[in-house]
Amino acid sequence: MMKKSICCALLLTASFSTFAAAKTEQQIADIVNRTITPLMQEQAIPGMAVAIIYEGKPYYFTWGKADIANNHPVTQQTLFELGSVSKTFNGVLGGDRIARGEIKLSDPVTKYWPELTGKQWRGISLLHLATYTAGGLPLQIPGDVTDKAELLRFYQNWQPQWTPGAKRLYANSSIGLFGALAVKSSGMSYEEAMTRRVLQPLKLAHTWITVPQSEQKNYAWGYLEGKPVHVSPGQLDAEAYGVKSSVIDMARWVQANMDASHVQEKTLQQGIELAQSRYWRIGDMYQGLGWEMLNWPLKADSIINGSDSKVALAALPAVEVNPPAPAVKASWVHKTGSTGGFGSYVAFVPEKNLGIVMLANKSYPNPARVEAAWRILEKLQ
């Protein structure tokens, strides 16, 4: 009898730990505030907007100023520059193009840009561009490259440091070119394709590449060394770092990416899943199309340390996953993003139906963003 009682007690303990009581909105707010308020003070961030997706439902929180000079507060409608979180939109749009049969990741880059006649481009595929494994394309396209002719010259003159697929080196010039070439045969501009194929179907009505005049009042200023700034235009900027969005739209973006089964357009649904497929393994991290994934559960150190620029921007050996592994629900899926005056972070765990969006109008170190997100989600799981 004693043995049976102990077994029952153990089962009850396991049950309670597995099925913890659901958090109230106030409890969620307290957890978020206890992390974000000191973060803003430590990093001198003028304004932030955070969304929590908890049990599939979004909760929104805002702090501080979107425009210091005019004393405009951050609201749920405030537009923030996403920086490299824009790459996740690029990846999903590319996935939609693949699902439609309009491109293949195995296609050579030269199929879509025949003017690239340099021998170094032989053997480089769209997959290599999308996943930063072409052989060492640089982080940025030089600022003096200002038109299409100069862009072609830049890529023609580039010389790889490694064979395609040997190493991953994070680069706007890599995934940016993927985005541009992925839509080339559609007859649409990248912005038009993004709007029609991704933003409109997902009802992201406040997500922009070019912020229209009617939305300028909601466009936050970013702050760099205390001065207000907006991102400067550049070649392939839309594809690599050019999206602006609100916390409400970004929560909707996370919800769609966390569970694509509710997305009505089948090719977009497949595109979302393709963006979270695993194409390469780099240490503990798996590279998708825009998104980066780690197996869940995991230790905080692995994502916090991995987000540091010394690691994230380093050339690291890449191990091909062939065939690519489909999206894994037990994953920490995430992406950081920065422009001169903004810092963003998005992370979610599909298996837990749990996610976070952090938007700030100051760029601050990635590890601080990831650690804050981890602290919050750890208390909510």
Curated annotation (Swiss-Prot):
It is found in: Periplasm. Changing residue 243 to L: In strain: GN346. Changing residue 325 to V: In strain: GN346. Its EC number is 3.5.2.6. It catalyses: a beta-lactam + H2O = a substituted beta-amino acid. Changing residue 97 to A: In strain: GN346. It holds the Pfam family Beta-lactamase. Keywords: Antibiotic resistance, Hydrolase, Periplasm, Signal. Residues 1-20 form the signal peptide. The class C beta-lactamase family has a specific amino-acid numbering system known as SANC, for structural alignment-based numbering of class C beta-lactamases, or else the simpler name structural position. A multiple sequence alignment was used to derive a consensus sequence and then the consensus was numbered taking into account insertions and deletions. This allows use of identical numbers, e.g. for active site residues, despite differences in protein length. Belongs to the class-C beta-lactamase family. This protein is a serine beta-lactamase with a substrate specificity for cephalosporins. This is Beta-lactamase.
